[in-house]
Structures are given as C-alpha cells and as structure tokens.
Amino acid sequence: MTLKSNLTTRIKRREILRKGMAGLGVAGLGGAILKPSALSRVAEAAAMAEANGKILVILELSGGNDGLNTVVPYADDAYYQHRPEIGLPKNQLRILDDHFGLNPGMAGFERLFKDGKMAILHGCGYENPSYSHFTSMAYWHTAAPNSGQEYGWVGRLADDLDPSGTSNFLVNIAARQSLAVRSKQHVPVVFDQPSRFMREAFFDEKEALSRVPDIGNVDNPSRRFLLDIARSANDASELVRDAWGNYNSPVDYGVNSLDLPKVVSLIDSGMPTKLYYVSYRNNAFDTHVFQNNVHRRLLTYTSDAVSAFIRDLERIGRADDVALMIFSEFGRRVPENVTLGTDHGAANVMFVVGNGVKGGHYGEVPNLTKLAKGDNLAYTTDFRRVYQTLISGWLGHGGGSKILNGDFETFDMFV
C-alpha cells in the first residue's frame, strides 16, 4: 500500500494494521534511551505477565512436513507397501514403542519423548483439505478454514487474553509478519535480527513514521495511533537489543537454532510476552524430489534446536512455564512419487513439547489401508482441538470457543 498525500485525513487504524504496521521492527528508532514513561509501561506489562507465568511458543515447519517419515509406523506393513524406496527401515529408526519410531536424525526428540516431555498428536487436519501452501497455511494461521477470517488465531488469542493491548505481549521473530499474529488490539513485535531490529517492511514503515509530525493536531486519532506505534517500536527495540546483548548461553542449538535462542533471551530478560511465533523460511519442508536426505537434515535441525531450547529454559529456571507447539500446513501423500519424494497431502502429526506436558501419543492414528481422496491420510483430529487444548489446558483461558468460533474437545495433555 502506498501512503498518499491525503494521509492526514485518510489513515485509519485498520488500514495501518493491514499494512503490517501492527508488527513494527523499526531500526530507525533504535538506540533511544527508555524514558520513565516507557519503563513504567514495561514494568506494568511485566507485572501482568507475572500474574500467570505460562508462555506459549509456536514453531511452524513451512512447506508441508512429511509426518509419515517423521514419526514412522514401522509396525504397519502398509507403510512399506506405499513407500518401497523411501520408507525408512526399522533398524535405522529411533524406536519409541512397538509401533512407532522417529526419523534417524531426531536424537533430541527421542530424548524428549522418552523423558515424558513430548506429546505426539496424530491425524491432525481439517475437512476438505487444501493442497495449496498459501491456502492451507492461511487456514492454520486463522484456525478458520474456508472463512476468509482476517485476523490470526494467535492475534485473536492475544486480544482475548489482554483486550487492553499491552505492549510486547506478542512477538513474531521473522522477516515479515505472519497472518497468525495479526490482531485487532495488539501491536506484535516483529523482528529478524535483534542487533538491527529490522525486517523486510522496514523502509515502508520508516517512511510512514517520518510523516507522523505532519498529521496535524495532536488530538487527531490517526496521529495518536501512529505515535503509539512508534512508541511501542521504540520501547521494544531497546528491550530486544538489550536482551540479546545480555544473552550468553553454553547450550548448543546445532546448525540451525530456528530463532529459539532469541525467545530464551527475551524470556530471561523479563519481557512480558505471553505468545511467541517462529518458523522455518521458504517452504523448507516441500520435499518433492529425493526426499530422504534433505528431510532427515531438516528434522535434525528441528530436533537439535527444540531439545536445546528446553535445556536452555531449564538453565534459566523457566522450563516449567513454557510449552512449544510444532505444526506444518499439511502432510504429504502416503505413496512416494516417481522422483523419490512426496507430494502435497493432508493429515499430519503435530508436537507439543515442555516440562509441563504429559508425554505420549494422542489422537487416533490414521489407517494406511483406508486412504482419503488423492491417496491421502484421512484426518482423525481437528487441528483446532490442539489449539483449544493449549488455550484452556496450558494458558488456563476460558475463551477458546470464542477465539476458535466453535467448541473443540481438548486433550488431557498437561500435568
């Protein structure tokens, strides 16, 4: 969207939020000293967060992770019949029980599962699945398939948890803001590199903020809103840089940390954030061709980073306060394709990890001999059941039905 000359009278709160200004990462405002008013706002927000110390972190595996080669049903002959070339033999797996084994690259996940800190949720999906990355991800981001919902489920959750829109309540570590965190009331903190506090939309946003002094009267609602955004970005940039500058951990996250050390640094700094969102970039899990090696490598990155994240939280004494949910926009088709990969599918596995999790298997395991349309796994668990479980079971919030626009049965997943 281009800011036109009539910005003075035409800017509306909703338009700015749509633009992405709701997730500001403003390097141009960096380096400023926090004024007493800013410090008081931060202190007030921190006190609110302390009242209920539970934090939810969400990790998105973009591209469509192959759940069948992640949590492998090695005891089911149908798995190998569908995948004669890319099926993973039992003697290579990290055996969990008498039916499932993890991909050989997932040593960290094996430890978490056997320590009772990881829940595996089977058959997660929704009716009439889309095989489009964009469309299916939008459904998962909004928790509203085929609805055109404007705001993300994490953003709506933030609004319901804290209708006042407390600063720094919601953090999205990424190059650009996810639909999942789009909110009516909250200004998500969106950044990629803490030292620069910059992301892809920075230059557009900097231009908009440069116009703030020209928006007329201080009582003008548009001016006040832009100034609130600028103030929020200024406060957040200082907090993020200080937190990252003070972070010094001996924990090894492996090759790709998936931005999880940044989350730990913010938690350890006392940032009042309740909801964090991180993700893989560039549809990394879209494994159409010669899948096995690249898929194992990606799962190793994920497993190493997530297990390190839990250890790092234990180091700072916050492991009991944090749950991590892991999802992908769809699974892969059950049969392998002719290029030794897999194509876009439907139902998939999800994971919830943390010290407060009752580890084990949840949901009905899909039947590999009774496939859905297109040789896909038939979903057995509506993914919103998992969201509802996190909202009510982990965060202790009773507004899940309103947020998700429906009643979804929860799992008894938390200690």
Model-predicted segments: where are they?
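Short glycine-biased active-site loop of nucleotidyltransferases that positions the nucleotide triphosphate
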Residues: 132, 338-344
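Feature for exported/extracytoplasmic and membrane-associated proteins, marking the mature portion
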Residues: 2-316, 335, 349-415
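Glycine-rich, charge-dense phosphate/pyrophosphate-binding loop(s)
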Residues: 318-320
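Acidic/histidine-rich, metal-coordinating catalytic segments
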Residues: 323-330
